[in-house]
Amino acid sequence: MNRNFLLVLSLFMFLTLTPCNAQSNKKLCCGHEPDSTVIVLNNQAVNVYTHWSNSPDSVKKAMTLLDRAIEKDPDYQLAYAHKAEYLKNQGELTQALETLNAYLKRNPTEPYTLLGAGLFYEKLGNKKEAMDYYKRAEENFKRLYEKDNDNAHEINRFFAIRLMEGPEKTKALYEAERDRLASNEERRKVNDALVMTILETPREQFLK
């Protein structure tokens, strides 16, 4: 499945802000190509946190590795995302949001991070700010799709719309665009399944 969709699929299922697996040396959805050094730091942090997340010292070590990655490459999306996820897991929602906003100061149109930050705002009770972030995410998912025709951007655009408008309107919009988004029946079935998951998941589940 497309890495960009996994980024937000796992996000709205509240498992993590990024794919759980470590990253290979590939460009991210924003087009940034990180140096291999920072990828190694990120992957080390993921490994430490994945295997020893119950240890305060290991959590601290993972955070230190991610901070080093961010210091070396301030545009490295996954390091910010993992740091925000680990802070969230420690109950530090405000710091998690600050981490995503630090990335967005440098990359204000990156929709996957906008969507994640919007969910944090809503979880913290700031629904108005959350809606603004969802809207910005929706607009930029559309922009990215028009640029590279990556189907994942459009599926995630429907997720942003669902958060703003609710499932009924989102379903109607998807049905109107369903055929345009799929080049074949197999792709259409995959899209249908992904969108139905978005539509049928209760909103409160997104905010747990």
Which positions does each model-derived feature cover?
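TPR alpha-solenoid repeat register
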Residues: 79, 113, 147, 153-154, ...
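Residue-level recognition of tetratricopeptide repeat
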Residues: 46, 85, 119, 159-160
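N-terminal leader/linker segments that initiate helical-solenoid repeat arrays
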Residues: 20-72
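Structural signature of tandem alpha-helical TPR/SEL1-like repeats
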Residues: 54-65, 90-102, 126-136, 166-169
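Canonical positions in the second alpha-helix
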Residues: 68-69, 102-103, 137, 144, ...
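Terminal, low-structured helical/coil segments at or just beyond the last alpha-helical repeat
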Residues: 25-30, 160-208
